[in-house]
């Protein structure tokens, strides 16, 4: 038995010109129900399976309030097990090995890196842009690596805040400007992360780790993904 995607519609899988277009619906069987597995989808025509776990096989789209897989309409972050050593339920991933939670976060981190780069590219912070951008819309490798290395400080925001993705992007923009700008004026930009003590402390911990790595090159105190 199959069920339509989380958003109540079936989504088209992007393939080459003239190729078959997949429409994925949620797979519901006795086994998936018993093990509370709700992230396996199947094409109703060709029976291709898609495990919607936020991994590299998902097409993640930033919807403002979070990341959504374009293939299924499922919120990608709902499928990520933050801090867990393995999935809570036994899931069989066809055609490849079971990915770990760090792999699940790779796509999220890449989206943060991309959107931070896009924002800074269109901003007026010329001093910051010269230091952190390789070209229009692309961060320097060391800056992108610092986002990935420090991401463990903020990943739990996904479980505790609405619009978590936008908030995390805001935190990283705040940190980058504070580190690479010689000025303390942020213009008209208002950062949500400074309005809440909890999120402000997250921004401060990321900045502290960021500065420590820049100064010493030591990543021992910062969990690397």
From Swiss-Prot:
It comes from the Viruses. It holds the Pfam family Herpes_UL92. Belongs to the herpesviridae UL92 family. This is Gene 31 protein. The gene is 31.
């Amino acid at each position: 038995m199959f069920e339509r995607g989380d958003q109540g519609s079936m989504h088209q899988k992007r393939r080459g010109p003239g190729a078959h277009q997949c429409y994925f619906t949620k797979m519901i069987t006795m086994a998936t129900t018993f093990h509370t597995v709700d992230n396996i989808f199947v094409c109703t025509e060709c029976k291709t399976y898609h495990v919607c776990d936020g991994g590299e096989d998902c097409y993640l789209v930033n919807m403002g309030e979070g990341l959504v897989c374009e293939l299924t309409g499922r919120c990608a972050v709902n499928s990520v097990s933050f801090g867990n050593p393995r999935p809570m339920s036994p899931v069989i991933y066809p055609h490849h090995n079971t990915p770990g939670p760090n792999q699940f976060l790779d796509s999220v981190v890449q989206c943060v890196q991309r959107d931070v780069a896009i924002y800074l590219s269109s901003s007026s912070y010329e001093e910051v842009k010269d230091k952190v951008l390789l070209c229009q819309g692309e961060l320097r490798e060391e800056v992108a690596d610092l986002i990935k290395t420090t991401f463990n400080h903020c990943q739990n925001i996904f479980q505790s805040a609405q619009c978590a993705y936008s908030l995390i992007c805001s935190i990283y923009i705040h940190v980058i400007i504070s580190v690479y700008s010689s000025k303390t004026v942020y213009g008209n930009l208002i950062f949500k992360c400074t309005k809440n003590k909890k999120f402000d402390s997250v921004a401060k911990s990321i900045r502290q780790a960021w500065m420590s790595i820049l100064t010493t090159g030591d990543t021992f105190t910062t969990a690397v993904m």
